[in-house]
Amino acid sequence: MVRESKSPHSSPTFCVRKPNGKWRMVHAFNKLNTPTIPASTTIPRKDVLQNNMAGCTVFSALDMVDGYYQLLMRESDIPLTAVSTPSGMLWEWLVMPQGLSNAPATFNRLVTQLFRPMRQFVQTYFDDIFVHSRASEGKTAVEAHLGHLREVLLCMRENRLYANINKCIFGAEEIPF
């Protein structure tokens, strides 16, 4: 995820406590983010996603593990992500760290593009993937849903994307959104 760096760039890093009591590493990429041109991408609207799932009777929700960390940085951009630790070490990210101004848009664009061919039964919202099915073409909703899940999981496997099994919901009549 990181390697030791000799980059001339450096952003400070520190830890903050998350609501669940665990710690999250945070980077102050202010100097890097200030001149960054914001990505022009649309943010998914929850009401549109919910409308696209209307009429379905079987749902699954997959939560991707550390979403940004699943995206490799472009080699030429790696030195820009260098962070200094309180101990004086300098590290650079090989994967996309949290805190980059265009990280959410970049991640969302990737997930949206990957699952676009499945948009009839998949909705994505950043690191959440919602699979929704109804009975059709002589298949029950459950049979259709199993086929949809296979397609989604195969796409994830082919693209080396991983879900947090502890946060996933499979084959439910409803899911929290």
Give the predicted meaning of each segment.
Residues 1-177:
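Retroelement reverse transcriptase polymerase core
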